Amino acid sequence: MYFGIGIERCKNIENMGLLWRSAENFGADFIFTVGARYRKQLTDIYNSFQRVPLYNYRDIDDLYEHLPYSCRLIGVENSPGAADLRGYKHLQRAVYLLGAEDHGITKKAASMCHEIIKIPCEAGCFNVSVAAGIIMYDRMLKLSSN
């Protein structure tokens, strides 16, 4: 059982730092970026890079070509038809893809995902690193209870 989590077209370096620290705390096997738009100056006072690797992919095709064998790409997007996280059954082998702070995941990325899930909220949407934390916490709770 393993999972990775990352952000497509991330533009805010702080969100990557928060994702990295949360990923370590929730047991992610790796994190990644797809077409990142920030300057690569990661500051990590907790040295998460020593325990959770970061992969950088040029674009969604590059990520898809490098998905581990028998692993599903799960998009996280508040869009019509997306499965509600509250009833979602996490897969044993999954890579979660979240979208940029300003636009969400691209249409091309959404079309390449095996599934799309959404986090219900009262209004608008969550910050991308907060959404990642919610997904990882939900995964930890549901899979540890099996």
Where are the regions that the model predicts?
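Short, acidic/turn-prone active-site loops that include or flank metal/cofactor-
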Residues: A36-R37, D59-I60, E101-H103, C121-C125
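Gly/Ser/Thr-rich helix-start
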Residues: L18, V76, A100, I105, ...
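Active-site/ligand-binding-proximal alpha/beta "capping" segment
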Residues: S79-K118
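Residues that form or flank phosphate/diphosphate-binding pockets in enzymes
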Residues: E14-N15, A83, G104, F126-N127
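Structured adenosyl-cofactor binding patch, chiefly the S-adenosyl-L-methionine
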Residues: A109-N146
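RNA substrate-binding interface of SAM-dependent RNA methyltransferases
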Residues: M1-S79, M140-L141
